[in-house]
Amino acid sequence: MSLKNWDNKTWLSSNSYIKSFNNFLLKQIKLNKNSQILDIGCGRGKILGSLSSKLSLKRKPIGLDIVKHKDRDKRIIFKKIDALKFLKKNKKRFDLILVKQTIHLFKIKDIKTILKLSRTLLNPNGKIIIFTLDPINNEIPTISIMKKKAEKSFNKRQENY
């Protein structure tokens, strides 16, 4: 599956990206107003909040992140918690467990545990959907900035010798 990267100018998702992401997602899984959704690594929860509104969810979706952003979306239940800790003690079941652009941040053994625990928390016909960056076709916007700063620093050091 392929989906265009965010707006490629900022780390935050643009409205057009959020809309295209949700449309793409809804082609992968049938969800409705009764669906239960968990987002592992939700960030500010903008995508999850938008999806909640689009589906008119009866229950707020749950978003997990290890950073508690001040400007997080109010349409979700946000939990500042490590995914493994949440999955180990959670008893709720989900129709969709979403892992967007975060799977690479976990250790291999933790990825296996996250997937195993997630599978046990799915409702019948539920899905785990993992999105990750294609490193060849998508460059994180900050990489080019970091590269320029590193080159500038290197050039300054060269001048001092």
Language model features: what each stretch is:
Residues 1-29, 44-76, 80-88, 129-161:
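Class I (Rossmann-like) S-adenosyl-L-methionine-dependent methyltransferase catalytic domain
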Residues 34, 94-95:
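Local beta-strand N-terminus motif with an aromatic residue
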Residues 35-43:
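Conserved class I S-adenosyl-L-methionine
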Residues 36, 126-127:
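Short glycine-centered segments of the SAM/dcSAM-binding site in methyltransferase folds
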Residues 98:
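A conserved beta-strand element that flanks and buttresses the S-adenosyl-L-methionine
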Residues 101-102:
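Short catalytic micro-motifs in class I SAM-dependent methyltransferases
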Residues 112-124:
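A short glycine-rich, Lys/Arg-flanked "PGG" loop and its adjoining helix->strand segment in the class I
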